[in-house]
Amino acid sequence: DHLLPQQTRGRDEHQPAMPWRQLPLFVATSVYTDEPYNVTRALLLMVILTATRSGEARGMRWAEIDFHKRVWTIPAERMKARLQHRVPLSRQAIYILENIRGLHDELVFPSPRKQQILSDMVLTSFLRKKKAVSDIPGRVATAHGFRSTFR
């Protein structure tokens, strides 16, 4: 019933996660858009499609993406565990990236005004605004919570 195995080590505080059965409707009604480019929505879709931490996705650089092999290689210095991580990119993830390719030189999802890494509050604000349902009553889902949606 889960895509990824449960973690075996002790956990820190649980982040509110969206129940996986509700994810397709949420994406279809609140995230997916026909807009040519909306940095927040594109970033959230990438977080969901890759099950990566939002900080890893916010810091994604074009040089890390191999379109031919459909792999995103996150350097060790940007990973929590300090080990290089290779993320396979689905057809949908490649589609998002191809639609925004060439818009920015280095960062894939830069802040529109400053061309630097987006604040971690961008996704939090979006999810609050959309009242993203979570597995914790009275709390909205968090970007980090999407990682546990796949466990």
Language-model segment annotations:
Residues 28-41, 50, 87, 99-107, ...:
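Short, basic (Lys/Arg/His-rich) helix/loop patches that form interaction surfaces
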